[in-house]
């Protein structure tokens, strides 16, 4: 039996995900252990700049995974038969139901370039301030070089 892979499956089994997880696992383990032993420590402040970057990158990647998973859930909701929707959600009109999930889908889709920009900014050390780092600002940034974005 050939099971269909979801985008989440592909995302979390990608080379980037595997490398990030393998790099960050011992760091996170050590920092959590230190924080448990000494409650005065701040997890986010532990580690050298490289370790902090890896912890930030894995958090952004996890956020990307959450958004992708949410998109997959929206598709499930949008596939529901009209009669089934009416049975499950009798207080909602079909228009309200579908508008809600379609808006949710659009919001999630629109957040993907921003999350990817944050991930690139973190991994490539572009130095773009977080408040100015969006998918739409990357093409205009002088800090992003052709070497950072390669066609493969």
Outline where the language-model segments fall:
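Charged alpha-helical initiation segments
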Residues: 2-102
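Short non-catalytic regulatory patches outside canonical folded cores
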Residues: 92-152
């Amino acid at each position: 039996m050939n099971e269909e892979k979801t985008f989440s499956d592909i995302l979390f089994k990608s080379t980037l995900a595997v490398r990030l997880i393998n790099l960050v696992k011992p760091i996170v383990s050590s920092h959590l252990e230190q924080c448990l032993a000494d409650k005065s420590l701040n997890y986010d402040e532990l580690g050298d700049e490289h370790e902090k970057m890896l912890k930030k990158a894995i958090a952004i990647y996890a956020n990307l995974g959450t958004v992708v998973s949410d998109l997959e859930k929206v598709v499930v909701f949008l596939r529901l038969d009209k009669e089934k929707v009416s049975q499950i959600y009798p207080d909602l009109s079909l228009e309200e139901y579908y508008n809600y999930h379609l808006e949710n889908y659009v919001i999630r889709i629109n957040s993907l370039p921003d999350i990817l920009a944050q991930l690139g900014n973190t991994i490539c050390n572009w130095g773009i301030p977080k408040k100015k780092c969006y998918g739409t600002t990357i093409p205009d940034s002088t800090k992003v070089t052709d070497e950072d974005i390669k066609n493969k």
